[in-house]
Amino acid sequence: MNKAKEILFSGYAKLPTGITASEVYRVIGVIVLIDVEEEIIVEADCTLATGLARKTVCELLQGKSIKNGVGDIAAEVDEIYQGSAKKAIITALRIIYD
């Protein structure tokens, strides 16, 4: 794959108070590498507090198409991720898309 077709995007959203991640970070960062020609998330990272949460969210995002927005991805996050940072993750994804 031609790396010139890949662009790094990041979105940040405030975390709810009282959760572990908010004690370490005040915001969550969601960072994605997007193939802009194919409109697909090639790689993802985030600043959730635990390795398993980061791994789950990143694996969920990788390979997803953003051609029609992030609504379907947000719905999948809503279904699969039942942590307190769910709304912040979805907000960060929407910021990336906008």
What do these predicted ranges mean?
Residues 1-12:
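Short, compositionally biased leader-like segments
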Residues 14-31, 36-98:
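Active-site- and interface-proximal helix/loop "cap" or "latch" segments in soluble metabolic
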